[in-house]
A protein has these predicted regions:
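Shared catalytic-loop signature of beta/alpha-barrel
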Residues: 29, 56, 72, 86, ...
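Conserved, mostly hydrophobic/aromatic
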Residues: 3, 33, 58, 97, ...
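Structured beta-strand/loop patches that form or line metal/cofactor-binding pockets in enzymes
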Residues: 1-37, 41-44, 345-351, 400-403
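Metal-dependent enolase-superfamily TIM-barrel catalytic cores that perform enediolate-based chemistry
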Residues: 124, 129-253, 257
Length: 403
């Protein structure tokens, strides 16, 4: 079996836009006509540049080769351009292509990928969702001034609704804006709002749901500890990425100073970056994103390292349903799995992109028994929703926010 063709799509994500403004998908085809799908959690370049990078990577290291040779593909791509170091853009390409290879491998074997990675540990996977506005766009620049992101009453109402639907864990991120400049001290207004938001949600859901407190590296260690003290009384399940991800030694200072478990990993890639998190004691919950972390096999290795240190894994997902499907395949095999990020109930445009919806029941994702990744991308929907813009998937404020 050899890979003979690669094709990419940059697909626009219509309102409400859960998962980002667009998704980047790839299809690999073998000489026997078997196809596999993958997806990148976008890199540091525009989406069409990234799509071309995926094609270039495939043409260099996969076309004409056997998709079973995952380790060889990873090593060649990891060493591309004389680098041999974690490169988030290259690993986004590798991750997309590697999961497409696994999709092919599973289809050829007639088995779900989880059956080829040690077998199924979990019949159902506990899931959580962010709190999203009920109507209109979810992007912060488009929402009304008063919304679930900044109003305790609306957040509590939304959380209670999700619990009624079956979720037993919800996430919010009210801790203030992100800046390209380094971590800062939170403003008192941000600490106060965060505490009021978490308090309102706790009062609304009681003990029926865990609360996941999301941040994205906004703070210094001391600033993060000030925030942690304010929300500790409401017993969040985790405090996510309290400081920038480049210095796990600093994150470890936060971990030692709070009773809230620290979670991190969506901006990390490969076993080498995650090893530093584990070795320094920076987090007890890892959040690899399979569209960036190096692929399914690489993330299985990350999870094994974590297991040896009694660290749990909670796969991250803020993109399209192919990364979601890959997360499900891996999570089903992990003894140290904690919880899975869902984009609500995998409905809306995520459902339209697939020929068969990801199954969600009573707060859990149910792993598919179909071969490969267990889902099939609807290529006609991809073709009907091209994205022509140049925006980055996510971005930070380019200027200092608190001069």
């Amino acid at each position: 079996m050899k890979i003979t063709d690669v094709k990419t799509w940059v697909v626009g994500n219509p309102p409400p836009g859960i998962g980002g403004k667009y998704f980047i998908f790839v299809r690999l085809t073998t000489d026997g006509g078997v196809v596999g799908y993958g997806e990148a959690y976008n890199a540091t370049f525009g989406p069409h540049v990234t799509a071309r990078m995926i094609e270039d990577c495939a043409e260099r290291y996969l076309v004409g080769r056997d998709p079973h040779d995952i380790e060889t593909f990873f090593r060649r791509a990891y060493s591309s351009g004389f680098t041999q170091r974690p490169d988030v853009s290259m690993m986004g390409c590798v991750s997309a292509l590697e999961m497409a290879c696994w999709d092919i491998i599973g289809k050829e074997a007639g088995k779900p990928v989880y059956k080829l990675l040690g077998g199924q540990v979990h019949e159902a996977l506990r899931s959580y969702t962010y709190l999203y506005p009920h109507e209109g766009s979810v992007h912060t620049e488009d929402v009304a001034p008063k919304n679930v992101y900044n109003d305790p009453d609306l957040a509590a109402e939304c959380a209670a609704l999700y619990v009624e639907q079956g979720f037993n864990a919800v996430k919010l991120d009210p801790a203030g804006p992100y800046t390209a400049f380094d971590g800062h001290q939170p403003r008192l207004i941000d600490i106060d709002l965060s505490a009021r938001m978490v308090k309102a949600i706790r009062e609304a859901v009681g003990t029926k749901a865990d609360i996941l407190f999301g941040t994205h590296g906004q703070f210094t260690a001391s600033g993060a500890l000030r925030m942690a003290r304010a929300i500790e009384p409401f017993d969040p399940l985790w405090f996510e990425e309290p400081v920038p991800p480049d210095m796990p030694e600093v994150m470890a200072q936060v971990a030692r100073g709070t009773s809230i478990p620290i979670a991190t990993g969506e901006r990390l890639t490969t076993k080498w970056e995650f090893a530093r998190v584990i070795e320094t004691g920076a987090a007890t919950i890892l959040q690899p994103d399979l569209g960036r972390s190096g692929g399914i096999l690489e993330t299985k290795k990350i999870a094994a390292m974590a297991e040896a240190h009694h660290v749990q894994v909670a796969p991250h997902c803020y993109c399209g349903p192919i990364v979601g499907a890959a997360n499900i395949q891996l999570a089903a095999t992990l003894p140290n799995f904690l919880i899975l990020e869902s984009l609500k109930q995998w409905d809306g445009f995520h459902e339209k992109l697939l020929k068969k919806k990801i199954e969600w029941q009573d707060g859990n994702v149910i792993p598919s028994k179909e071969p490969g990744l267990g889902v099939e991308l609807d290529e006609a929907v991809c073709e009907a929703h091209p994205y022509s813009g140049k925006a980055l998937h996510l971005h930070m404020a380019p200027d200092p926010l608190f001069p």
